């Protein structure tokens, strides 16, 4: 049995043939070249999408494990869509820079301050904020994401370790919650 091709990432928008379809969050007509992709429908026809890009260089497509839907990442902006449909199911993010695979089929998207988890069925959720400004050395082992969170606070300027459990959705460490709002000793109210 041969697997049917669902998409083809294009070098540029086609210069001939049917007009491409702009895919944006607000349905605006987007004429500049973004991330061009040809999709192959189940009926044998095809269409070309021009995805509005986000803020990074990450351009990739993932076939989701438990659905016919695809995850398209256009320069950091995510689009979940079915190749047979022109309108995306979901659009989110603008600054994703890295994708990691969890052992159970989940995808972990790294942003500057938090993570977004894509479940095998295409649903997604965000972690709480982990860092003030920057995540580094992210890795996944046994559904536990670990790495470093940047702390740019005055006289600190350091990277702090964190761990995030994908199953219990709990964060340990990180830089964002490392400062408590303590009352000065002289205030009694």
Where do the model's predicted regions map?
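Repeated scaffold domains used in trafficking and secretory/extracellular systems
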Residues: 4-27, 51-67, 91-106, 130-144, ...
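A structured, charge-rich N-terminal accessory region that forms the first stable segment of a protein
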Residues: 23-30, 35-42
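Short, solvent-exposed loop/turn segments at conserved positions within beta-propeller repeat blades
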Residues: 28-33, 72-73, 109, 154-159
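Surface-exposed loop/turn elements that mediate protein-protein interactions on large endomembrane-trafficking
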Residues: 36-53, 75-94, 113-132, 156-177
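Long amphipathic alpha-helical segments with strong coiled-coil/leucine-zipper propensity
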Residues: 58-60, 64-86
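A short hydrophobic beta-strand element
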Residues: 70-72, 109, 143-149
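Loop/turn-rich, solvent-exposed surfaces of beta-rich toroidal or solenoidal domains
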Residues: 101-117
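Acidic, small-residue rich beta-repeat scaffolds with periodic aromatic anchors
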Residues: 141-189
